[in-house]
Amino acid sequence: DVVASSTAHKQQDINHLLDK
């Protein structure tokens, strides 16, 4: 699922930003 993949990637980016 392309949409789910895109959402998961965005969530990873958010998690990385919050991790700092």
UniProtKB/Swiss-Prot annotation:
Subcellular location per the Swiss-Prot or TrEMBL entry: Secreted, Extracellular space
Compositional bias (Basic and acidic residues): 10-20
Tissue-wise expression: Hemolymph.
A GO molecular function held by the record: oxygen carrier activity
Residue numbers spanned by region Disordered: 1-20
Keyword Transport: yes
Keywords for the protein's UniProt record, in alphabetical order: Copper, Oxygen transport, Secreted, Transport
Similarity comment: family membership: Belongs to the tyrosinase family. Hemocyanin subfamily.
Function per UniProt: Hemocyanins are copper-containing oxygen carriers occurring freely dissolved in the hemolymph of many mollusks and arthropods.
Subunit organization: Composed of 3 major subunits (IB, II and III) and 1 minor subunit (IA) which form homohexamers and heterohexamers. May also form larger structures.
Protein name: Hemocyanin subunit II
